[in-house]
Amino acid sequence: MELDEISNLPGHVVDQILSQLSIREAVRTSVLSSKWRYKWATLPNLVFDNECYSFSSLDQTAVKSKLVNIVDHVLLLHNGPIYKFKLSHRDLQGISDIDRWILHLSRHSIQEFILEIWKGQRYKMPSCLFSCQHLIHLELFNCLLKPPSTFKGFKSLKSLDLQHVTLAQHVFENLISSCPLLERLTLMNFDGFTYLNIEAPNLQFFDIGGVFNDISFENAFQLAVVSIGLYDKRQSHANSSNLLKFFVHLPHIRRLEIQSYFLKARPEEQAAVGTVTNIKEDNNWSCHQLRLVKILGISGIKPELNFINLLLSTSPALEKMTVKPASNNGGWELLKDLLRFRRASVQAEIIYMDP
């Protein structure tokens, strides 16, 4: 393509080309012609990640200085709305300029904000982040959240992804309950709280992995996909009655993935675990829309088998249940137990995976 043709491309074509480039490549298009010189400065989506940098020969101090200069340069020359801002790098720790950048973004109706600090201590999010009322997607890695007392929630937020984060129990509960449009929630390797009370009327997807004591749902009737990974079996307080209470509040669940530590009752609770028949008779309970189930790390103890039996006998739409034991010990007996359970769905398939 000749230079004149490049210069005369329609605006929407130029925008499409720029949207496919990294911010580094987009800035370089300024040399193509005068019409392209600052065209990149109108990009609504700004992504600063490893693809934008080439700092392999620099020491950490020089890398940080270069990072700050790049982001400052782009934000200074940028002209127009900023809908998405992503900052992800292994050397972001100790860069106080992040506060200043977030303050700048809070004045530009930011809709999608992603901050991933791969090393170092938790980065305390500045109070100005909590004034970003146009946020639709928020993703934080290795951060500390302490909202100001004036924070009333993110009224437009639909997706929240928190990994390696620290926040207090009341902060978590207030955050979730004050995001009325929240549809997707991901929590991984968090600390500061161990009890999760999820109040989210529009929540459809929930993925959790970490160390916690209990999960309960309140007004979360739209939830369809649930994935639970408990990383420390000593923290599990689950028994059949708790699990029943858990699923009674999820009438529209369609897909479930669960790590078996969540199913293991403490020894003193084993005797209190009710039978599936009693639970069904007492509660008239059914998972009418459950289609896919995956249970990992089971060992064949009574709470696990009760739970599997309950799902199989009360899920008329179930298509597939995948079960993976924690070890080879007792695998054949476990398989025989699984095949003995009655299934409410004639099409339900049980898939046994080797450990």
Regions found by a protein language model. Give the residues of each.
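Leucine-rich repeat
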Residues: M1-R184, M188-F190, D207, ...
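Concave beta-strand-loop units of leucine-rich repeat
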Residues: N50-Y53, L87-L92, L115-G120, L140-L145, ...
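C-terminal capping segment of individual leucine-rich repeats
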Residues: S106-R107, S131, G153, S178, ...
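Loop-centered beta-sheet repeat module
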Residues: G192-V225
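Extended repeat-based solenoid scaffolds, especially LRR ectodomains
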Residues: I215-A265
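Hydrophobic, well-ordered secondary-structure elements that form the walls
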Residues: L256, V293, L311
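C-terminal helix/juxtamembrane-tail motif
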Residues: N329-P355
